[in-house]
A protein has these predicted regions:
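Extended, highly charged
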Residues: 1-136
Length: 136
């Protein structure tokens, strides 16, 4: 089972490279990201993990479709797709306690106080009926 997002993405890239798509050109978070995902699904019948590296207005990338297929979700859970329900229920019945660490990958970038600016995060508008941009 993948222990974190990075190891999961590395596993998808290595074992299912056709299911990982990197978009290197700049995209607009207002409608364009969602339009790209929908177009790929409708025209090519594909739902790969999508990494948008350059998102207008932010220094952060955007990822989508992380678990958009049963086989990828099963990969993340470390099981066969037909065993997903059993694996998930077993995990819920036997939870693993969180482990606090002083350093680690989750602490690569630490912002505190005035350095924290939520407006720096990508704010996506998915559809015309959205109330505006939001963080997902």
């Amino acid at each position: 089972m993948s222990q974190d997002l990075r190891s999961y993405l590395d596993k998808v890239r290595a074992e299912r490279p056709e299911e990982f798509l990197t978009v290197s050109r700049e995209v607009d978070p207002a409608y364009e990201i969602t339009a790209s995902i929908v177009k790929l699904e409708k025209e090519a019948k594909r739902r790969p993990v999508m990494l948008f590296e350059k998102v207008k207005g932010t220094d952060f990338p955007v990822m989508s479709n992380l678990h958009a297929s049963r086989p990828r979700l099963a990969m993340a859970l470390g099981c066969n797709p037909r065993d997903m329900q059993k694996t998930f229920l077993a995990a819920m019945e036997n939870p693993i306690a969180p482990k606090e660490v002083n350093n680690g990958l989750c602490k690569d970038v630490v912002l505190k106080g005035a350095a924290v600016d939520m407006r720096a995060l990508p704010q996506v508008v998915h559809l015309g009926g959205d109330g505006g941009p939001y963080i997902t």
